[in-house]
From Swiss-Prot:
PSII is composed of 1 copy each of membrane proteins PsbA, PsbB, PsbC, PsbD, PsbE, PsbF, PsbH, PsbI, PsbJ, PsbK, PsbL, PsbM, PsbT, PsbY, PsbZ, Psb30/Ycf12, peripheral proteins of the oxygen-evolving complex and a large number of cofactors. It forms dimeric complexes. This is Photosystem II reaction center protein Psb30. It comes from Euglena anabaena (Euglenaria anabaena). Belongs to the Psb30/Ycf12 family. The gene is psb30. A core subunit of photosystem II (PSII), probably helps stabilize the reaction center. GO terms for biological process: photosynthesis. NCBIfam families: PRK13686.1 (NF010239).
Length: 33
């Protein structure tokens, strides 16, 4: 398996998962519960 491909897929998965979580976290921190 190509290491670069694994890194790209890992980064894409991380962004896909972390993006909404970061937005949600910032939304909560502003007191909009």
């Amino acid at each position: 398996m190509n290491l670069e491909l694994v890194v790209q897929l890992g980064s894409l998965l991380l962004i896909t998962v972390a993006g909404p979580l970061i937005v949600f976290f910032l939304f909560i921190r502003q007191g909009n519960l």
